[in-house]
């Protein structure tokens, strides 16, 4: 699992049927509480993350399972928003 910060949205008007209803977000990876120069695109189907929020991202086969459609062509899914204490 990765920690990151949502830095942007990606709009896709044409996409595979399995991806309809998914929100695409650009996430900047955080390592050791420091923003890195690494970015990924992750889908958000359930947590409604927004720009500026820190999120938890799962990748690989776990990401496909998290979408509810194990055959979806998804590599990264936002599974949680990090609460600030």
Identify the role of each PLM range.
Residues 1-14, 81-82:
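Structural detector for short beta-strands of small beta-barrel domains
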Residues 18-26:
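Short aromatic-glycine-enriched beta-strand elements
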Residues 33-40:
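Short, structured beta-strand/loop micro-motifs enriched in basic residues and often containing a Trp
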Residues 48, 55-85:
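C-terminal structural segments of small proteins and small subunits
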Residues 25-29, 41-43, 56-58:
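Short, acidic/hydrophobic/Gly-rich beta-strand patch recurrent on exposed beta strands
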């Amino acid at each position: 699992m990765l920690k990151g910060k949502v830095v942007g949205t990606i709009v896709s008007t044409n996409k595979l049927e399995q991806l309809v209803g998914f929100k695409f977000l650009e996430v900047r990876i955080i390592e050791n509480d420091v923003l890195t120069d690494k970015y990924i695109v992750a889908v958000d189907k359930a947590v409604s993350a927004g720009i500026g929020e820190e999120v938890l991202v799962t990748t690989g086969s776990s990401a496909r399972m998290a979408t509810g459609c194990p055959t979806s062509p998804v590599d990264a899914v936002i599974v949680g928003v990090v609460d600030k204490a």
